[in-house]
Each structure stands twice: as C-alpha cells, then as structure tokens.
C-alpha cells in the first residue's frame, strides 16, 4: 500500500472544493514570453476547476497566433511540484449529495472533465511554443497541462507518474494519445503500474523533450524571456543548448527495458501477469506484479484497452473524445469512489475493488466503458 499512500499525499492533499480565487494561476508578460505560474503550492499545485476556468480563455486568445508570435513558460509555485494531479476529491463529494442538493448545482463529474479536456486540446493545438518546466511532481492533470505542448523540461527534482489505476480510474487528460506513442511499450507499463520516473529518466522515456540541471534553469528562463523571435525552432535551440550543458548519470529507465518492452507488448493483461510470474528470480518482476495486483482490476483492463485504441486514433482530439466517454462510465461504477474513499477520505489505504480480480472481468464489461453516451453528452471537437 506504499504506492497508494504516495498517490494520496501527492494528488489529494489539501484540495479545496469550489475555489474561485483568481490567484491560483498567475500570469506575467515579459517581452513575447507569457509566464504561467500554477499557484497552489500547499496543494502541490493540484489542478482544480477554477484553474481550468482561468487558463482556458488565455489559450483561446492564442488560437489565432502564429508560431513565433509568443512563447509560454509554465511552472508550479514552490519547490515541490509542477502540478501533482487533479481535484478528484470534489467529484467524490458531489457523489455524496442527495438528489435535491445535486439539482441545485452543476454535475461536477461532467463539467470538470469536459472543461479540462477542452483545455488539454487547446494546449495540444496551440500554435505557439509552450515550455513546461517540471520543477517537482508532475502527475495526472499536470501532465495534461504540459505534455501536449511543444516542450517539457525535466530537472533533477522531477517526479513523473500517471497513477490513476491505483485510485480506480484511468489515464486520462490525453494519456491515450501520448502514452502509447512512447517507445519500447513503456507507455503501457507506466499506464498500468503507475510507476514513477525521476529526473533524467523522464527525458529518456520520452515524456520530457529536454533535461536541464537546476543550476541552469534560471538562465534558461531568462534567455527565453529575452528571445525576440520565439519560433518553435528557436526555442528548441535554446533548450538544446542548456540540455547539452547539463549532466546526469541517472539512467534507471534502461533497467529491465528489454523485459518491459517484451512483457508489456503482450495481447492481454492476463498474459502480462503470466509473463511476470515466469520471472521468479527477478525482484523487479515481483514488485511489478505486486503493484498490478494492488490496483483496480477494472482500471487495469480498461486502461489496457484504452492504450490499444488510443494508439490507432489519429489525433489528441479523438483520444479526448474517447476519454470523456470513459470518464463518465467510470463515474457510474464503484471503483473510482472506493479508491478516493480509501486514499483521501477514510485513508485506510485498503480499497475493496469490484470486481476484485481481472479473471472476473470479460471483454463485454470492458467494452461498456467505451460505449457512446446518451442525451447528447458526448464531447465533440
């Protein structure tokens, strides 16, 4: 349960429900550079609906710009996190309302995911360069704010994860687009296990586009701020210069890479389990199997299918449309709310998943998470 405790601490800590503070995202213009600061350091800059509402108009303004007419630098406030996830507790709290109370407020389960995914797509189609600096934890919803932009910078302090299977959910915010496109089946491995990548390994895996040592970050930011022609090519050249200056001996990414590529390229979750069980003398295989057996079986099965389908979809927008469908079906099932209960509410770190085993989940049940929504609820771009 150590992994579940990590998720609890880094996603749900100190999340407030319906904040309207305009100070939760701060903007500063320096020349052609727009600096964006995610400003909830006590909550590890966890993304909430208010922050989505603040960010969306800014990205809408940029739709008509051309490459080179500006550059965005996004960071998290404080020294611990870029953005450690999303406001999942608020969705749980909405579920606990009675029907009369629900009738007096918006369905946050629909509204939050719909607006968040719209923002994710705006970031992914933004014509100007965005540089996201992973100054600490970068997880879940924070990945949706950054990975679809042109550039992501890892530092020694970066900790990346998509830990959603551990809370009975799935790798959303465009996870079905970027994860299957990582080399060596590493995206499938990260999606199913929620494993963390640290420092230079975030770059080696392909999540970050560059690695820059902490000692060079201030100079990097200053050069981007002073850039008079911030085309994607120019910004890439600046980033590459500081990347080349930076030294890192961290390369755990390559540990077990052959086994990850082989095992997580199998045709089913059951086959992945079987292959891990065959590696009796591998501590990595034992720990990986232990992790997979601790997370939601439903999440495992759905995420596996999500990665397979996402690999074939032509665009981020199509992946987000699929993910919105999946998100709403998850909110009709028990595991997400049980995961949040166990990690954030009762904090017993002992979720009771239903069904409790992958052997009790057939393809028909998996397919039900991908069915079109009724009553014109579909997200369409």
Swiss-Prot record:
Gene Ontology molecular-function annotations: 3-hydroxyisobutyryl-CoA hydrolase activity
Parts of the chain that traverse the membrane: none
Residues that bind substrate: 116, 141, 164, 172
Keyword tags: Branched-chain amino acid catabolism, Hydrolase, Mitochondrion, Transit peptide
This protein's pathway: Amino-acid degradation; L-valine degradation
Recorded catalytic activity of this chain's protein: 3-hydroxy-2-methylpropanoyl-CoA + H2O = 3-hydroxy-2-methylpropanoate + CoA + H(+)
CDD domains: crotonase-like
Family, similarity comment: Belongs to the enoyl-CoA hydratase/isomerase family.
Function: Hydrolyzes 3-hydroxyisobutyryl-CoA (HIBYL-CoA), a saline catabolite.
PANTHER family found in the cross-reference section: 3-HYDROXYISOBUTYRYL-COA HYDROLASE, MITOCHONDRIAL (PTHR43176:SF3), 3-HYDROXYISOBUTYRYL-COA HYDROLASE-RELATED (PTHR43176)
Protein name, per record: 3-hydroxyisobutyryl-CoA hydrolase, mitochondrial
């Amino acid at each position: 349960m150590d992994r579940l405790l990590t998720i609890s601490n880094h996603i749900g800590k100190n999340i407030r429900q319906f904040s309207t503070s305009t100070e939760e995202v701060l903007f500063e213009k320096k020349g052609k550079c727009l600096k964006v600061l995610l400003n909830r350091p006590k909550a590890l800059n966890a993304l909430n609906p208010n922050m989505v509402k603040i960010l969306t108009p800014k990205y809408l303004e940029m739709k008509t710009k051309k490459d080179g007419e500006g550059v965005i630098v996004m960071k998290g406030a404080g020294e611990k996190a870029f953005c450690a996830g999303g406001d999942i507790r608020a969705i749980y709290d909405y579920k606990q309302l009675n029907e009369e109370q629900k009738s007096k407020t918006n369905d946050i389960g629909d509204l939050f995911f719909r607006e968040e995914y719209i923002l994710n797509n705006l970031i992914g189609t933004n014509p100007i360069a965005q540089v996201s600096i992973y100054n600490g934890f970068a997880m879940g919803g924070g990945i949706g704010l950054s990975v679809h932009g042109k550039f992501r910078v890892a530092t020694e302090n970066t900790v990346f994860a998509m830990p959603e299977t551990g809370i009975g959910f799935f790798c959303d915010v465009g996870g079905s687009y970027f994860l299957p496109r990582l080399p060596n089946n590493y995206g499938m491995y990260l999606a199913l296990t929620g494993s963390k990548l640290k420092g230079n390994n975030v770059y080696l895996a392909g999540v970050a586009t560059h690695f820059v040592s902490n000692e060079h970050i201030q100079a990097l930011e200053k050069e981007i701020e002073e850039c008079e022609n911030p085309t994607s090519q120019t910004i890439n050249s600046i980033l590459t210069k500081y990347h080349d200056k930076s030294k890192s001996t961290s390369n755990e990414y390559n540990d077990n890479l052959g086994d990850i590529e082989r095992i997580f390229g199998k045709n089913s979750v059951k086959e992945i389990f079987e292959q891990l069980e065959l590696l009796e003398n591998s501590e990595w295989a034992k720990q990986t199997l232990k992790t997979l057996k601790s997370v939601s079986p439903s999440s495992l099965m759905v995420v596996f299918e999500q990665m397979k389908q996402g690999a074939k979809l032509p665009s981020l927008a199509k992946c987000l449309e699929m993910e919105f469908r999946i998100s709403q079906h998850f909110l009709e099932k028990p595991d997400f709310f049980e995961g949040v209960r166990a990690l954030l509410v009762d904090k017993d770190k002992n979720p009771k998943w239903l069904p409790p085993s992958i052997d009790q989940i057939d393809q028909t049940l998996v397919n039900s998470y991908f069915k079109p929504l009724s009553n014109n609820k579909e997200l369409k771009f």
